[in-house]
Amino acid sequence: MNKTPLPNLETLEQKWYVIDAADQRLGRLATEIAMILRGKNKATFTPHLDTGDFVIVINAEKVTVTGKKRQQKVYRRDSGRPGGMKVESFDKLQKRIPERIIEHAVKGMLPKNSLGRKLFTKLKVYAGAEHPHQAQQPEVLAINTIPAGGN
């Protein structure tokens, strides 16, 4: 009986990628980011190991959604106290904390366990075009989230 080869975590190379979120669709962008964070784009993917890469997202303030989601999509947070639920639309949250929109979308696509929390720390989201990770020499990754017959 053959054994499944496991990747050696010491020799595993983790790259840094920069993704520009300007005029990209939120859900499709988050799907691609989650796949890279998990390492599903690599031949060495193992479900229970951290084989993914680091992702830097810039221009988070310019991410788009289709239809009426700009006004109708809501984000909820709760203080835990009676009557402490705060509801905020996509449009208002994008003006206030644009990074949180992409973080929320990607976090929902990662495993809900300790590995998922570890993978989430490898995501760096910035509202503007600048990021402080030049020392890691990130590779620019072009993602097209607008469908061919899209609007």
Curated annotation (Swiss-Prot):
User: Which Pfam families has this protein been placed in?
Assistant: Ribosomal_L13
Q: List the disulfide bonds.
A: none
Q: Which GO terms describe its biological process?
A: negative regulation of translation; translation
Keyword Transmembrane helix listed? The answer is no
One GO molecular-function entry = mRNA binding
Among CDD domains, the record links this protein to: Ribosomal_L13
The record's annotation in InterPro entries points to: Ribosomal_uL13, Ribosomal_uL13_bac-type, Ribosomal_uL13_CS, Ribosomal_uL13_sf
List the GO cellular component terms.
cytosolic large ribosomal subunit
Tell me which UniProt keywords the record has, alphabetically: Ribonucleoprotein, Ribosomal protein
> What role does this protein play?
This protein is one of the early assembly proteins of the 50S ribosomal subunit, although it is not seen to bind rRNA by itself. It is important during the early stages of 50S assembly.
Please give the PANTHER family that the UniProt record associates with this protein.
Answer: LARGE RIBOSOMAL SUBUNIT PROTEIN UL13M, RIBOSOMAL PROTEIN L13
Q: Report quaternary structure and partners.
A: Part of the 50S ribosomal subunit.
Q: What is this protein called?
A: Large ribosomal subunit protein uL13
Organism (species):
Microcystis aeruginosa (strain NIES-843 / IAM M-2473)
